[in-house]
């Protein structure tokens, strides 16, 4: 995928999502979504008991999104805060997913909320996203509000259950709910069948060429 994106054969990230291809390089997302924004959700110390004593590291949760239907979430542990944040950003970029948006009531104007009720879970936490009328805003906790804003959701009600004080699980549950917006078919999608070949087949000749190593 990286070679096809670099050569300009794949120009939209939707082509990758259509065939459910894995994104294994953050540079792919940098090229296809240059307007991504980054937001640090939480940084906290974690400890591990060893024979030499307690070993303290830092864990960071970072969300990325373009506020237009694409969002990713990543976490990383490192000895230093800066290293944990940098690693979490790379993981978040490789986990970017599309978010399906819709309307509450009539289909006037731009999409502004989730199309149906969706639920995500992680551990004991359950987060439910409920469509809201235009002008409501994001009714959620401050951390979840950041994630929903990066996803491009303008109006939504949220309901959470479980041990929501575990902030990492709350963030993951909300991200899972956003992923579930594309886990079902509605009648307006029934006629859209994909008849294209997978990019690996379309560009077989290009991929079969041997890459020459640069000489310095």
Task: Label every model-predicted segment.
Residues 2-216:
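Ribosome-associated RNA-binding proteins
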């Amino acid at each position: 995928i990286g070679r096809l994106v670099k050569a300009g054969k794949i120009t939209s990230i939707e082509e990758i999502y259509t065939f459910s291809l894995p994104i294994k390089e953050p540079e792919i997302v940098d090229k296809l979504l240059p307007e991504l924004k980054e937001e640090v959700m939480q940084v906290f110390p974690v400890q591990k008991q060893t024979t030499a004593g307690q070993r303290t590291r830092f864990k960071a949760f970072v969300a990325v999104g373009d506020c237009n239907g694409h969002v990713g979430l990543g976490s990383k542990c490192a000895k230093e805060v800066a290293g944990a944040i940098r690693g979490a950003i790379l993981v978040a970029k490789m986990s970017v997913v599309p978010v399906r948006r819709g309307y509450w009531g009539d289909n006037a104007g731009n999409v502004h909320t989730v199309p149906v009720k969706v639920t995500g879970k992680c551990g004991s936490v359950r987060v439910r996203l409920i469509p809201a009328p235009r002008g409501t805003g994001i009714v959620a906790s401050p951390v979840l509000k950041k994630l929903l804003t990066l996803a491009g959701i303008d109006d939504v009600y949220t309901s959470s259950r479980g041990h929501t004080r575990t902030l990492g699980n709350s963030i993951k549950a909300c991200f899972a709910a956003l992923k579930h917006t594309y886990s079902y078919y509605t009648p307006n999608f029934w006629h859209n069948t994909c008849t294209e070949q997978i990019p690996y087949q379309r560009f077989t000749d290009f991929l079969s060429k041997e890459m020459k190593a640069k000489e310095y």
